[in-house]
A protein has these predicted regions:
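Solvent-exposed, non-transmembrane amphipathic alpha-helical segments
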Residues: 24, 32, 60-67, 146
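Short, solvent-exposed loop/turn segments at secondary-structure junctions
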Residues: 19-20, 62, 98-100
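Feature marks hydrolase-like catalytic cores characterized by long aromatic- and Gly/Pro-rich stretches
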Residues: 36-43, 48-81, 108-112, 162-170
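Catalytic-core region of carbohydrate-active enzymes that cleave or remodel glycosidic bonds
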Residues: 1-53, 86-87, 108, 115-119
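Acidic, Ser/Thr/Pro-rich beta/coil linker or hinge segments at domain junctions
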Residues: 108-109, 115-169
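Carbohydrate-binding surface patches
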Residues: 67-135
Length: 170
């Protein structure tokens, strides 16, 4: 969208309502619920890790801008897309597999090819947000969706709400 309007996109923001004493995971597009970070906040954390200039990403299952604006992600297939940036010494790549129906489907194989980073070796750090990683909402549902969680449950939810580093490869 920024490209189509020739805007220099420097960051991501959100717009949300926040009301005190609301049920857990009630909505309002907020980034946290009762002090526990929601999975969407981890997306913003990943945006914050991206450095340098945005570079082109292509794929055979990415929705185009017009489809996103006109009808969001409602076709028979998921939007398997990405966002990437690079500077002189690093590259960051964010890949997603998303559909508005919010139904868990099998993982899609993804191949990432990075060109133009002059190095013979690299360290790859992987972060994941899915039903098992960086997702306080899924943990809360597995707890039985408590509206009055115990201190112990809140501690577990707080940990699950953080962006989880899944692997580091050299």
């Amino acid at each position: 969208l920024a490209d189509s309007f020739k805007v220099n996109f420097l960051g991501a923001v959100t717009w949300a309502f926040e009301f005190e004493d609301q049920p857990w995971f009630y909505g309002f597009r907020d980034l946290a619920t009762n002090g526990v970070d929601k999975p969407v906040l981890n997306v913003f954390r990943m945006f914050g890790m991206m450095k340098g200039r945005r570079v082109a990403v292509s794929g055979n299952q990415m929705y185009d801008l017009k489809t996103m604006v006109d009808s969001s992600v409602r076709r028979s297939y998921n939007d398997a897309g990405g966002l990437a940036a690079k500077d002189k010494r690093s590259a960051t790549v964010m890949v997603w597999n998303y559909h508005d129906d919010d139904v868990i489907k099998p993982a899609l194989p993804v191949e990432i090819i990075i060109d133009g980073v002059p190095t013979k070796s690299a360290i790859v750090t992987q972060y994941i947000i899915d039903d098992k990683h960086s997702n306080s909402y899924e943990v809360w549902k597995k707890m039985g969706s408590p509206q009055s969680p115990t201190k112990e449950q809140i501690a577990v939810l707080e940990k699950a709400g953080q962006l989880e580093k899944v692997s580091v490869m050299k």
